[in-house]
A protein has these predicted regions:
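N-terminal subdomain of nucleotide-sugar transferases
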Residues: 1-61, 179, 256-258
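Nucleotide-activated donor-binding/catalytic signature segment of Leloir-type glycosyltransferases, i.e.
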Residues: 269, 276-304
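Membrane-proximal helix-turn-helix segments that form the acceptor-binding/catalytic region
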Residues: 25, 97-98, 118-127, 154-176
Length: 413
């Protein structure tokens, strides 16, 4: 019987830094259900300059409330992709395997990350009779191809695809946070029905979510004194990275189409390579209706910020959601009880399924602006009904419910 679990996620961080809540919420609720859980994450806090280890130690143990962490020393990196980040990933996973004997042997490892070139932790688990679940939260290495960075026929990509496929085959189970995972395997013809090696009976779908108890508590207890949030304008909020994959420039240009409206304010929270160029664009084009706010918000303040919006934005490059999405902020948007506009077509769209906004490919900024305007000018009774549907939809993605789904997978091993 499985009782002791390692949750391995290089990017898992202590609660005060963590905006991607999946790992720490699973840890919390798995423990409530009787499991012993240890989280293994990097010493480096992603997208920050913070390194929790500064004395040459290979690892440190830390307790954050009921969360038991082991932070593995990893090298710093500045960019979201690049040699230093790849090396940091490799270093973390190989160092974890080297140090593994220092910790109590688990019955199960749930690994959310592994270095692209190989998977030493999976091999370690096989050698020591430990069950292994792969968690997949994005489409690496496919993103390299989807963003046009490299051809799928590139020899390196062929190797990386083979590594990923082998990982799915040799894991005891694979849990995707993206609903289109089954179609993904079918399209690649990796599933056994199409002659491939991947048994889809060992593949499961559990999306990301939101902890509604925390969200509602934090919304009431952690408020920000901010004139923009207190204003009577209808606030259209984007929260997230400001980089290539998020295509925030299209959102800014859509806001430009609405610059004559004095009743609307566009607020952008987040950081990334595109932030400064977009700030300059707004200054050059005198866009006073667009404001770039904090580069980073402590998670406990996010619920209040989103609760002050009139409309929230999901923004991506074309074709991003071809198998669905698992954006944590989408579920926070739902919990805030506000409509959502997304600028790309998403397969298995929760926005369309629950009728809580607009979601389709926006061919240009004018079409994007028209979509935003349609929510802003919606009759009040229709708007309030949409808000209520958003809150109701969030219940399907409450972390206690999602954890029960994970336990069902664990009990099948």
């Amino acid at each position: 019987m499985i009782k002791s679990i390692w949750l391995v996620n290089k990017y898992a961080m202590p609660p005060q830094y963590e905006s991607r809540l999946r790992t720490i919420k699973f840890a919390h609720y798995l423990q409530e259900m009787g499991y012993k859980v240890t989280i293994f994450g990097s010493s480096v806090m992603h997208n920050t300059d913070i390194d929790l280890i500064d004395d040459g130690s290979k690892y440190i143990k830390r307790q954050y409330g009921d969360l038991s962490f082991v932070h593995i020393k990893s090298c710093q990196y500045k960019k979201t992709a690049g040699v230093h980040r790849v090396w940091s990933d490799i270093q973390f996973h190989y160092r974890l395997v080297k140090l593994a004997q220092k910790f109590e042997k688990p019955d199960l490892v749930v690994a959310t990350t592994f270095p692209l070139i190989s998977n030493p932790l999976l091999k370690y688990c096989h050698r020591h009779g430990i069950k292994y679940i792969t968690e997949v939260l994005d489409w690496w290495p496919d993103d390299f191809v989807d963003f046009g960075l490299v051809s799928a026929k590139n020899p390196i990509m062929k190797y990386l695809f083979k590594v990923a496929q082998n990982n799915y085959v040799k894991s005891d189970a694979t849990v995707f946070s993206i609903k289109g995972c089954y179609k993904y395997f079918e399209d690649k013809r990796w599933d056994t029905f199409h002659g491939g090696p991947v048994d889809l009976s060992k593949v499961y779908y559990i999306n990301n979510g939101v902890d509604l108890a925390d969200f509602n508590k934090w919304k009431d207890e952690n408020k920000i004194d901010d004139d923009d949030l207190k204003s009577d304008t209808k606030k259209v909020i984007y929260l997230g990275s400001v980089r290539l994959a998020n295509n925030v420039g299209q959102f800014v240009k859509a806001a430009e189409q609405l610059k004559e409206r004095k009743d609307v304010q566009f607020l952008i929270y987040g950081d990334g390579d595109d932030r400064e160029p977009l700030i300059m664009y707004c200054e050059d084009h005198h866009l006073t209706n667009v404001k770039f706010k904090a580069k980073w918000i402590e998670p406990k303040y996010v619920p209040f910020v989103l609760s002050q919006s009139y409309l929230n934005i999901l923004n991506y490059t074309a074709h991003f959601g071809k198998y669905g999405i698992s954006s944590s902020k989408m579920f926070q948007y739902m919990a805030a009880g506000k409509p959502i506009v997304c600028n790309v077509d998403i397969m298995y769209s929760d926005i369309l399924e629950h009728q809580i906004g607009i979601c389709h490919d926006m061919k240009d900024e004018q079409e994007y602006a028209d979509a935003i305007r349609s929510i802003l000018d919606m009759p009040q009774d229709e708007y309030e009904a949409m808000c209520m549907r958003a809150q109701a939809a969030a219940r399907d993605y409450d972390y206690p419910f999602l954890t029960k789904q994970m336990v069902e997978v664990i009990e099948k091993l």
